Amino acid sequence: LLESAGVDQVDYRAAIVNPLVRNEEMLYQLNGISMYSSTNTEEMWDFVKNMGFENLENRFQYAGSTEVTDMLLGIRYLFCRNTRKLHTVYKKIGESQSFDLYENPRALKAGYMVSDSVLDYAMEGTDPLEVQNRLLSGIAGKRLYKMQTVSSEAVWAGTVDFDISLKKGEHGYLYIPGTEPETVTINGQEQKSDYWNNNFLDLGTYDTDTVVHV
């Protein structure tokens, strides 16, 4: 699939959206961002945690990424097991028996120049979208995400529902502060906290106005 799609792993990264095991990107010799290792540093852990990636002290992985982090970290290719439907603006450029392959045309190469105002950026905060907004302000002088509070409905003990309205072409994310939910279902697709950041959810983007049920 890599060869047939002409994947460039010299200038760009490739990530697996829904891995089955830790370090699966390494297993497939992908130049990804996920890692499970006792050599992980505190500085790296702080970075991926604040940016929204799924993480613990000795690991981090792609889950929790956004279009912004894909762009900034040069993630041009996404492999998604075809047991899951990916609602994305990225173009599907290949498929195999197990994976669909998507390409992100806005991914930046390994090195690029930014305003020196980024040196004043403080990597702090608990809301990944606000952290990314501040980082973008330091890089380009602009904020990207429009923030709003959404209400939830308690269905039964320990369970809440959200209904989030997205306009056509709008990419939605939902941040749930506090204790990470063990299981989340987004429009019928279930994800466990072991391999996903269930505090920070990618709601996808759609061709028509859509209500996403979480």
Model regions: which residues?
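Soluble catalytic regions of membrane-associated enzymes that act on cell-envelope
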Residues: 1-197, 203-207
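Short beta-strand-plus-loop segments that form exposed binding edges in beta-rich domains
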Residues: 214
